[in-house]
A protein has these predicted regions:
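Alpha-helical transmembrane segments and their juxtamembrane interface "caps"
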Residues: 27, 31-35, 44-63, 77-81, ...
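Helix-coil boundary and interhelical linker segments in multi-pass alpha-helical membrane proteins
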Residues: 1-6, 28-48, 88-104, 148-153
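Final/C-terminal transmembrane alpha-helix of multipass membrane proteins
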Residues: 136-152
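Core segments of transmembrane alpha-helices
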Residues: 60, 80-89, 138-143
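Mid-bilayer segments of alpha-helical transmembrane spans in multi-pass integral membrane proteins
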Residues: 83-94, 103-119
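The first (N-terminal) embedded transmembrane alpha-helix
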Residues: 9-29
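C-terminal ends of transmembrane helices
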Residues: 58-72, 115-127
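Cytoplasmic-side transmembrane-helix entry/capping segments in multi-pass membrane proteins
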Residues: 71-83, 105, 130-137
């Protein structure tokens, strides 16, 4: 799959769940599927990085279900999703020698994932009559898309 499409997909994951995207990238780098050694993002493939991101992702999956969690569209959450999408796009871009375009694709994906994910979740909330099943569907979508993206590297 072309690197720009992969960067857009993983950016979309960052828009859905900001820590799931770098978790997938870190595991791919650690496994050797994403060759980042010797680059500025080589730390993504270090032995501890995937575990740290995994813990952060689990924390985010739990925190997302709490009623006090702020909207993903609020500036802190939105900026975090943009940073995550850009970072993950950069990782793909470094490995594919297409850094600027993949960063841009990661950013665009994060915007699409943030606003598209919010709209989809609100629609699912209306359909289910409650938020929890909608949130779980979104979790599964983020994990599934991330797995597909790294399997396509």
């Amino acid at each position: 799959m072309p690197p720009l499409v992969l960067a857009l997909l993983i950016g979309g994951v960052a828009g859905l769940r900001s820590m799931t995207a770098p978790t997938a990238i870190a595991w791919a780098a650690y496994a050797g599927w994403l060759p980042l050694g010797g680059t500025s993002l080589g730390w993504m493939g270090w032995w501890g990085t995937p575990w740290i991101f995994t813990l952060l992702a689990i924390g985010e999956l739990v925190a997302d279900k709490l009623p006090t969690t702020p909207s993903r569209k609020a500036p802190p959450g939105f900026i975090g999703r943009l940073v995550s999408g850009a970072l993950c796009g950069a990782a793909i871009g470094l490995a594919a020698s297409s850094l600027p375009l993949c960063i841009a694709a990661g950013l665009v994906g994060a915007v699409i994932g943030t606003f598209g994910g919010h709209a989809a979740r609100m629609g699912l909330c209306r359909a289910f009559g409650t938020d929890l099943p909608a949130a779980l569907v979104e979790d599964l979508a983020a994990i599934g898309i991330a797995a597909f993206a790294v399997a396509s590297l």
